[in-house]
Amino acid sequence: MGSVTNLRYHLVLTTKYRRSVLQGIEQSVYDAFREVEKVSDFKIIEMDIEDGNHIHLVLKMSSRYSVSSMVNRIKGMTTHLVWKREPQHLSRFYWKGKRTLWIGAYFCSTMGDVSDDIVLRYIQNQNSPKKANL
């Protein structure tokens, strides 16, 4: 018999050197996350790019994988997809052949003690001009 889980996480990924590289390519970034979602074991509830240098995500994930392995998968695949879509834009910020996008660290918190509505309102009230079309 399988297990039933309801694991929700607030994940924040920050760009390398905290550069505002996501500014102007927001839709490409959102599309990359949606593409990774299709082939992975998580669901995006909400996502929002802030200041062009970090993205907030609310994810529902399976207990099959560890958080760190899922985050590494997300970071690796989105880096590849965004570079594939926006090489000229990203090469203005990152050079010497290094196809990087995210810093090694990340913030991740479970949402067990907080309702979806509270976290979603927090993310939506970050004054971002460009929101994801969910």
Protein language model features and the residues they cover:
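Basic nucleic-acid-binding interfaces
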Residues: 1-134
